[in-house]
């Protein structure tokens, strides 16, 4: 049985919903399962925020030299370290973007949403052709979440966004390379890449909410970049999504790396 059959077997017995895309950027081959299924984005919504951050720096809408002050008004719990710092610390857009991705810092994310503009971020999302992705609330906004206001995306949209990171005419190559370097510094590596040797380059981002476990990124074997997107939704008290990510990662390592 080939890789596709092995992965489909895992998905078939998963106790929930899976959205998956594996796309060979050179050979053009792809595997898609429920790629149009709209799911809570969790921290994957930070990927289009990262894109818009670099886009606004590239076209001069914001300055690379600008320093943004930490304030208690944007304090956010969950993942990240900025919530533990005293107000008055100043950080650059690059500092905030790096923290938002590498340790999934929610406070850094909210500061970027404020500084870049939620409408601008959603305009960028539409401009990139991500028709099923939308930023509707900041991180850790539980009041909005209880009212059903959620950031959403699909595996197909995330795969398309990651393809823009690799090849795009809308952002300079240097900016795209910088974003990929930030993704490659990811500190949350308990899913797709959990059992891979450290030498394997994987520029990626995870996402988690109760019952939601995602891992998506750009894998760099010796010959070609691969886009890998795995989104899962299951019981809020289950870790089945993390297990599926690890199992798919093990198959990818055995069959492709």
Give the location of each predicted region.
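Structured C-terminal helix/loop/strand segments within mature extracytoplasmic catalytic/sensor domains
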Residues: 1-9, 13, 30, 125, ...
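Short, glycine/proline-biased beta-turn/loop segments that scaffold the active-site neighborhood
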Residues: 59-85
């Amino acid at each position: 049985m080939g890789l596709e059959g092995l992965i489909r077997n895992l998905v078939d017995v998963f106790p929930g919903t899976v959205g998956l895309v594996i796309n060979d950027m050179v050979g053009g081959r792809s595997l898609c399962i429920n790629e149009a299924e709209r799911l809570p984005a969790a921290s994957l919504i930070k990927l289009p925020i990262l894109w818009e951050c670099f886009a606004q720096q590239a076209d001069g809408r914001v300055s690379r030299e600008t320093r943004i002050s930490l304030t208690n008004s944007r304090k956010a719990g969950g993942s990240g370290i900025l919530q533990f710092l005293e107000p008055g610390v100043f950080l650059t857009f690059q500092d905030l973007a790096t923290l938002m991705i590498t340790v999934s810092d929610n406070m850094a994310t909210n500061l970027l949403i404020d500084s870049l503009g939620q409408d601008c971020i959603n305009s960028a999302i539409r401009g990139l052709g991500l028709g099923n992705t939308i930023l509707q609330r900041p991180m850790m906004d539980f009041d909005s979440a209880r009212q059903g206001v959620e950031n959403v995306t699909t595996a197909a949209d995330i795969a398309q966004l990651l393809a823009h990171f690799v090849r795009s005419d809308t952002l300079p190559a240097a900016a795209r390379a910088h974003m990929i370097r930030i993704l490659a510094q990811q500190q949350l590596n308990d899913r797709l890449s959990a059992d891979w040797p450290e030498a394997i380059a994987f520029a990626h981002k995870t996402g988690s909410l109760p019952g939601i476990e995602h891992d998506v990124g750009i894998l760099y074997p010796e010959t070609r970049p691969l886009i890998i997107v795995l989104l899962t939704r299951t019981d809020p008290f289950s870790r089945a999504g993390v297990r599926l990510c690890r199992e798919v990662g093990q198959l990818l390592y055995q069959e492709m790396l």
